[in-house]
């Protein structure tokens, strides 16, 4: 299942991000027709204190040559109103699917979070937007979206689910990984643990 997603992207004329001409803000919606919901991504919500998810979005789904991504939105299907401490990382990648449960897109200390802080997930259904503190320079290829939940507690009385769509049932369709923890936050610089792997992708919106 692929999560529905919205990007907000500042598209730069001629695909040159350092150009000052022909700038245009565009909203990109991915998976708008998805009819599935999941609690496993983008923010894992199956009653664990720590979790990390990573999802691959293809260049043809994003549909722009290059740009600065300034926000991301996910489609809330079950509104829990959970308080979570998260960090979001975006990374340009050639990877188009996961071949195994440890086949992460590797993050390094040079990969700065585009957002880091405390959020409260929606109390109503609908699109939920996270505005980036640092816009991300998207270069036109595939994109890995990693969300590290560092909260350390969970509320068993509340539950979130997010809109998604299926990318198919075969191995080449596996485009989301998730891993959970109980005693400490997931080390995003050392993603060596075996992860859950599945063929759902979140619906989403990017502003560019």
Label the model's feature ranges:
Residues 27-29, 53-57, 71-73, 87-89, ...:
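Ordered hydrophobic segments in well-structured contexts
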């Amino acid at each position: 299942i692929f999560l529905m997603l919205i990007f907000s992207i500042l598209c730069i004329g001629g695909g040159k991000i350092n150009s000052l001409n022909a700038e245009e803000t565009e909203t990109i919606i991915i998976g708008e027709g998805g009819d599935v919901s999941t609690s496993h991504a983008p923010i894992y919500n199956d009653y664990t204190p720590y979790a990390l998810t990573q999802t691959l979005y293809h260049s043809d789904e994003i549909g722009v040559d290059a740009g600065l991504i300034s926000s991301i939105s996910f489609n809330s299907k079950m509104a829990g109103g959970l308080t979570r401490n998260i960090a979001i990382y975006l990374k340009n990648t050639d990877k188009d699917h996961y071949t195994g449960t440890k086949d992460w897109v590797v993050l390094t200390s040079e990969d700065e979070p585009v957002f880091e802080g405390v959020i409260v997930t929606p109390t109503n259904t609908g699109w939920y937007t996270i505005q980036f503190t640092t816009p991300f320079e998207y270069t036109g290829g595939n994109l890995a979206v990693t969300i590290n939940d560092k909260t350390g507690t969970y509320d068993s009385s509340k539950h979130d689910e997010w809109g998604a769509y299926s990318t198919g049932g075969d191995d080449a369709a596996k485009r989301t990984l998730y891993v959970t923890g109980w005693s400490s936050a997931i080390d995003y610089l050392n993603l060596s643990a075996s992860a859950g792997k599945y063929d759902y992708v979140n619906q989403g919106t990017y502003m560019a």
